[in-house]
Amino acid sequence: MFKSLLLGAIASVFMVTQAMADYTLIVPQAPGKGTSVWGEIIAKNLEKFIGEPVVVRHIPGARDIPGFNKFHNDLRFDDKTIMVAHGGNGVSYLLDKVDYDYFDYELIGSMNNDIVLGKHAGADEKSGTWTIAGGSGFEPDAAAVAMLLCGPQGNNTIDDYLKCWRERVIWVNGVSGGEKRLGFKNGEFDVARESPAAWKRFYEGIEGNELWFTHGILDLENNVQIADPNFPNTQFEDLYEELWGEAPKGDLYQAYKLTRNWRDAIQKSLWMNKGNPNAAKVKAAVTEMINDPVASAEIYAKTGVYPWIQDGPSLLAALKSLITEKALKDAVKWNQEAYGFPSIYKPELLK
């Protein structure tokens, strides 16, 4: 009898302790980086609407993969744990060895974001050698640059574009973000690449600098790419057609669309384990946060004003539709041979 009472008391304490535990946002970066700052802003505002404390736990690692793997293999089974993922995680899901799988999770909310590319004012895409300081996250950006510099190439195969790329581009890996900015301003590098907020902070209004293009954002309802309302008349496809007299097409373009949308449509996103009993509550709190003018203003000050997506099944279906054997293999080949990235082909993604 006493033993039963004791076990009951222990169980009650355990349940109360679990109920009182803080919600935790897992961020796969060290403090101070872009997604980490976004996660801190989300935590601060989300707890106002969820009615419970929300803390941030940083789990940094190579290419921001270990933290997401930790969530997948262990932490997602805690009912109060939320994963904060970024666009690089989306590209790594396609092209790197990872444990995590978006189709095992419930989407709580995703900001459909963009990336801004700049060049020196008056630089002619059709001539000269361009030096680009690249790195992780550049996969779709530099593919778009290659198409703008090279235009239509033979049968528009990956090999056709690699030939032009090697003739027109000097690709430099291993340069930090601050060094990239300084190198661009000093004329050492020919391309600038930033988040919308960083573009406005570091480049807007600087003499000799020119906003070159953006990728646009996904219109999920119609499953098409539309112009970024924050940067009108800068859509990559429109600029390409203006330069070359026809719309982009071919193998590199299909690989570009694959990595672009897997990066940008989930560039700042929140996930919980599928079947998590708290997911509906957290999702509703995120909806309230989005609709609150004070909270949303603080978030948009960091990211720019971009739409949120909370329909996980529709978003993942749209992204899944881009994964074909051809596009996946071409993305791997381009990343390996143009950038020197250790990308791998993952046939399991076709299932």
Label each residue range with its predicted role.
Residues N261-A327:
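Secondary-structure end/capping motifs
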Residues V16-Q18:
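N-terminal signal peptide c-region/cleavage motif recognized by signal peptidases
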Residues K80-M83, V98-G122, G128-G134, Y253-N261:
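A structural signal for short loop-to-beta-strand junctions that line the ligand-binding cleft
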Residues Y203-I290, E337-K351:
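C-terminal lobe and pocket-closing loops
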Residues M20-Y105, S136-D141, L149-E204, P293, ...:
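N-terminal (or domain-start) structured segment
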Residues G8-F14:
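Bacterial N-terminal signal peptides
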Residues M1-G8:
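Sec-dependent signal peptide recognition
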Residues G90-V98, S110-D124, A142-G151, D264-N273, ...:
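Periplasmic solute-binding protein
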